[in-house]
């Protein structure tokens, strides 16, 4: 019976399952969007929401607790500095699961799990990136193009032909 048993086993041992979820939450926070199977995404949603809630509290104690789950220092800093600030007003539900169909190899049900405010964060960052791209294009247009260097590949077939002629 499964009375009062919470969570999924995902056909893994306890150690493997916790290691997998820690790696997945680190990837989710780094990229803010990952593609995985639907059962894994549902478990990851529970796990990631708990880690983000720790980051929202923001104390040194909560940073240490989150450090047990997030295995990369850069991602941990990103979590506490930027991601937690974006979710200050939201009481929960920090991730979204979108089903994307079935995997070709084994017909597994696949889903995208992403942070809810990812689109808003990309819009703010996207405007800055667009400005940077236009600046780079303008700088490239101003620079004169250099003359191309002569190719060495044309000399190689002649050398091979000479060697063959010398051998015969």
From Swiss-Prot:
The lineage of its organism: Bacteria, Pseudomonadati, Myxococcota, Myxococcia, Myxococcales. The keyword Ribonucleoprotein applies. Belongs to the bacterial ribosomal protein bL17 family. GO terms for cellular component: cytosolic large ribosomal subunit. InterPro entries: Ribosomal_bL17, Ribosomal_bL17_CS, Ribosomal_bL17_sf. Residues 121-168 are annotated as: Disordered. It comes from Anaeromyxobacter sp. (strain Fw109-5). GO terms for biological process: translation. Keywords: Ribonucleoprotein, Ribosomal protein. This is Large ribosomal subunit protein bL17. SUPFAM superfamilies: Prokaryotic ribosomal protein L17. The keyword Ribonucleoprotein applies. Residues 121-146, 159-168 have a biased composition (Basic and acidic residues). Part of the 50S ribosomal subunit. Contacts protein L32. GO terms for molecular function: structural constituent of ribosome. It comes from the Bacteria. Residues 148-158 have a biased composition (Basic residues).
């Amino acid at each position: 019976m499964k009375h009062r048993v919470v969570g999924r086993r995902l056909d893994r041992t306890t150690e493997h399952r916790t290691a997998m979820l820690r790696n997945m939450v680190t990837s989710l926070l780094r990229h803010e969007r990952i593609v995985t199977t639907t059962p894994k995404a549902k478990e990851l949603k529970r796990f990631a929401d708990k880690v983000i809630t720790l980051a929202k509290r923001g104390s040194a104690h909560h940073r240490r607790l989150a450090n047990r789950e997030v295995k990369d220092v850069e991602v941990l800093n990103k979590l506490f500095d930027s991601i937690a600030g974006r979710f200050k007003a939201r009481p929960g539900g920090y991730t979204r699961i979108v089903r994307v169909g079935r995997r070709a190899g084994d017909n597994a049900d696949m889903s995208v799990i992403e942070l809810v405010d990812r689109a808003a964060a990309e819009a703010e960052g996207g405007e800055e990136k667009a400005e940077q791209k236009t600046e780079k294009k303008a700088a490239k247009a101003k620079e004169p193009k250099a003359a191309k260097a002569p190719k060495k590949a044309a000399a190689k077939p002649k050398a091979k032909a000479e060697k063959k002629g010398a051998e015969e």
